Regions:
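Canonical P-loop GTPase G-domain recognition
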Residues: 232-285
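Juxtamembrane inter-helical linkers in multi-pass membrane proteins
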Residues: 440-444, 497-527, 602-626, 670-672
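Conserved G1/Walker A P-loop phosphate-binding module
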Residues: 92-173
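Juxtamembrane and boundary regions of transmembrane helices in multi-pass small-molecule transporters
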Residues: 522, 534-542, 550-614, 722-786
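Extended helical scaffolds that flank P-loop GTPase cores
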Residues: 276, 283-455, 659-661, 665-670
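Hydrophobic alpha-helical transmembrane segments
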Residues: 367, 396-444, 449, 456, ...
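Conserved C-terminal guanine-recognition region of P-loop GTPase G domains, centered on the G4
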Residues: 160, 185-252, 561
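Extended, low-charge hydrophobic alpha-helical regions
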Residues: 357, 364-365, 384, 425-466, ...
Length: 786
């Protein structure tokens, strides 16, 4: 029987894992190894994918992938809780004492003050970025869904100016399945950090230690940060830290990154092992006398180490790490070592003998060896807690939020509530108040400059240029802050991962995976981090498709445009029109995705293998940090890009080609420039040169559209009513919804897609699609009498 046939609420034992290539290795790395007990928790509302529980955590799989896993021993779910044992408390060793773990000193000690570099490495969603913030005092955004960190970030460890730590993307192993795993592995091999800080989720220690074992094989000074120990204790669990140190051969420091507990001790141990070059005390986790093929694995790995030792030394790759990767069939490592034909044949012969003796293939044998060691260690050192409050709370919440009949209505209700509160109640109200305040300040400055008798041209620059341009954009700050507040709550709570789970089957119909939904949701805030978040997708096809679709998710920078026009033309229906624009972007994106799926991006989307974290109450600090960062970014942009754009626009609309002050802006330099683009927009119903000019400046930053119009209208926004009817204003909004992203987003596209040509095509593609859709809206409107 295969895993996809297992009934909800039943347990079974994995017999074998089918499939091939990197995906199968990823399944094994995630703990889906023969002999592992799994529980079928639920199916997604549309019947696919499914949620499994194994090794104390939840994992999602598609039915097609689950069909490749053979199971047996089906029975009802075991609800018996772990028996609580009493473990004697042993004081944790101080820095330099080494306690009962034994390190190997290489002798390459550094003097105090010499530079130290660390890699901060751990599974996804284990608190890694929170720890990075505690170590460095930085304010990186923290979320409760897999893949928040999509790029490496460097920071200086507090009170240690000589020590730099790099926050690397969350990974599950050092196998080259995802881009993050390759980035992390390359960092360790090429950058050669002086030390590793491996953060482990203590509430899910069994799966987390799988990566730890591979990091130890890198033979780099290392400490293990046992995070979330406060939750383990609160739920009646225990981890015997000293015994764990003895088993792993590295310092283990219990911490709570969220509560800033144990951070000082962690820093001291990390600095010590790095400075004195104290490498892990053991690299060999094979059981030389083990049963079920364990001894064969031991002999095979040691034989491979002997075979490749010189090649590994020349390639500057740790021999033990290289050997295990070769046994797994890692082609990248094989290529880097440069073995000759005879050596490759010898290698394959060794592995073939091991496979025959183990009765397992190479990948399953290595994964089984690691997990058997982990199970043995956990049996000796860990008393598992009873079901945590967070997990019990998550199970109850998921009955509604991922329920068969309630998931989609709940998602629609949540998003509708967010948009209504942002655009119709809280955000809009605060924006109106701020606008009144800015008008008061502008009026006061105008009267003060008039009383002072300032030169009229300079007076115009300050009031009609700077105050009008920057002030008009700043007035929309509350809307953006409120939107990011709600998006941050979705991220921190863990709901983002559930959305991906619920939407996977639907997204598959348009050629994408449920994992693509997270970057697209982030795109409602800003396209730049959304495009970067596609790095969490293991498939190049899915990654590129998601990048191309992300600009259709209306970013927050367009909100000032929407707010300005809805206030002027649809004051009673502001929220409704804005929500309609967002859904229009989604619909056009879906249609474009179907086109891509059947043309340039044919094929199947990436498998949906993702951990579902427990729901957590959003951290006030994390939410506040994100809001502050976004508000600061918006204000900075207002006083840099928008400030400069306002001055340039004022200059171009004040002077003619001979630099004479014009009486009518129709004679200005700006009218000349805008006149070239205006004919393109005549079929759309807004061919005035001022409108085309504003759209052109929107390429630098979408907020510039509002500041440009404000400057061109001399602050009198009632001029809009002479250029637009409510219907033509709607057509204009549709165009701005879909046309080219800002220059920062285009730069991100270039970086992620790898070529300037791709970025240029995105600009052209978005502008063409925007024009076609806006024209279609206008034609349909005219046919029905608008």
């Amino acid at each position: 029987m295969t895993l996809d046939k297992l009934e909800v609420g039943k347990d079974a034992v994995i017999e074998s894992v089918g499939g091939k290539g990197a995906l199968r290795r990823h399944f094994l790395d995630m703990g889906l190894t023969p002999g592992t007990e799994v529980t079928m928790m639920k199916k997604a509302p549309m019947g696919d994918p499914i949620e499994l529980r194994l090794r104390s955590y939840e994992l999602t799989l598609r039915l097609a992938d689950a069909a490749q896993i053979e199971i047996s021993g089906i029975h009802d779910t075991d609800t018996v809780r772990s028996r609580q044992a009493h473990l004697k408390d042993i004081p944790h060793p101080q820095v330099g004492e080494m306690g009962i773990y034994h390190v190997r000193k290489k002798g390459n000690e550094l003097r105090e003050g010499e530079p130290l570099t660390f890699g901060l490495i751990g599974n996804q969603n284990c608190g890694k970025t929170t720890l990075f913030n505690q170590l460095t005092g930085a304010n990186q955004h923290v979320g409760n869904f897999p893949g928040v960190t999509v790029d490496r970030k460097d920071g200086q460890i507090k009170n240690h100016p000589e020590a730099t730590v790099t926050d690397l993307p969350g990974i599950y192993s050092l196998s080259p399945y995802t881009n993050e795993e390759i980035v992390t592995r390359d960092f360790l091999i090429q950058n050669k950090p002086r030390g590793i800080i491996n953060i482990v989720d203590a509430t899910n220690i069994e799966r987390n230690l799988y990566l730890t074992m591979q990091l130890i094989e890198m033979d780099i000074p290392m400490v293990l940060a046992l995070n979330m120990m406060d939750e383990v204790r609160e739920n009646g669990g225990t981890i015997q830290v000293n015994r764990l140190e003895e088993a792993l051969g590295i310092p283990v420091i219990p911490i709570s990154a969220a509560k800033n507990e144990g951070i000082g001790e962690l820093i001291e141990h990390a600095i010590h092992v790095a400075r004195y070059d104290e490498c892990p005390g053991r690299l060999d986790f094979c059981d030389a006398n083990g049963e079920n093929g364990q001894a064969a694995i031991h002999r095979c790995i040691h034989a491979v180490v002997h075979l490749i030792e010189e090649h590994a030394k020349k390639a500057e790759i740790p021999a033990r790490f290289a050997a295990t990767k070769l046994v797994e069939g890692d082609k990248l490592i094989l290529q880097q070592l440069g073995l000759d034909r005879n050596e490759e044949e010898t290698l394959e012969h060794m592995i073939h003998e091991m496979e025959e003796e183990c009765a397992k293939d190479r990948e399953a044998a290595l994964a089984d060896m690691r997990f058997k060691f982990i199970e043995k260690v956990c049996t000796q050192t860990v008393v598992k807690p009873t079901e945590s409050k967070a997990h019990a709370r998550s199970v109850k919440a998921d009955k509604i939020l991922t329920g068969k009949y309630t998931a989609l209505p709940a998602f629609a209700a949540i998003m509708g509530l967010i948009f209504w509160l942002t655009f119709g109640v809280i955000g809009a109200g605060l924006s109106d108040w701020l606008s009144v305040g800015i008008d008061i300040v502008t009026d006061f400055a105008d009267r003060a400059l008039t009383a002072y008798g300032l030169n009229p041209v300079v007076h115009s620059l300050i009031i009609d240029g700077i105050f009008a341009g920057v002030g008009s954009v700043l007035s929309f700050l509350p809307i953006i802050v409120v939107l990011f507040f709600f998006l941050s709550i979705l991220e921190d709570s863990g709901y983002m991962a559930r959305i991906a789970f619920v939407m996977d089957k639907l997204l598959r119909k348009i050629g994408l995976s449920g994992r693509s939904f997270v970057p697209m949701i982030i795109g409602f805030g800003c396209s730049v981090p959304a495009i970067m978040a596609t790095r969490t997708l293991s498939s190049e096809r899915d990654r590129k498709m998601t990048i191309l679709l992300t600009p259709f998710m209306s970013c927050s920078a367009k909100l000032p445009i929407y707010a300005l026009f809805t206030y002027a033309f649809f004051p009673k229906y502001r929220a409704l029109v804005m929500v309609g624009l967002y859904f229009t972007g989604i619909i056009v994106g879906v249609l474009f995705s179907l086109l891509l799926k059947n043309t340039a991006f044919q094929g199947e989307p990436v498998p949906f293998v993702m951990e579902l974290p427990n729901y957590r109450l959003p951290s006030l600090k994390s939410v506040g940090m994100l809001i502050w960062d976004k508000a600061k970014d918006f204000i900075t942009k207002a006083f840099t890009i928008i400030f400069m754009a306002s001055i340039v626009i004022w200059f171009l609309q004040t002077f003619d080609v001979r630099l004479n002050v014009v009486v009518d802006s129709k004679d200005s330099l700006l009218a000349l420039i805008g006149g070239f683009a205006a004919p393109v927009f005549v079929p759309l119903g807004f061919g005035d040169w001022r409108i085309s000019t504003a759209l052109i400046t929107g390429f630098t930053a979408k907020e510039s559209v509002v500041s440009t119009l404000t400057v061109l209208f001399g602050g009198d926004m009632s001029v809009l009513n002479t250029l637009f009817t409510p219907f033509s204003a709607l057509v204009f909004l549709v165009f701005t919804l879909l046309y080219t992203p800002c220059v920062a987003a285009i730069a991100s596209v270039k970086r992620e897609m790898g070529t300037a040509r791709s970025a240029f095509l995105v600009v052209i593609m978005q502008c063409v699609i925007a024009w076609i859709v806006a024209f279609a809206v206008r034609m349909i409107g005219m046919l029905i009498g608008f």
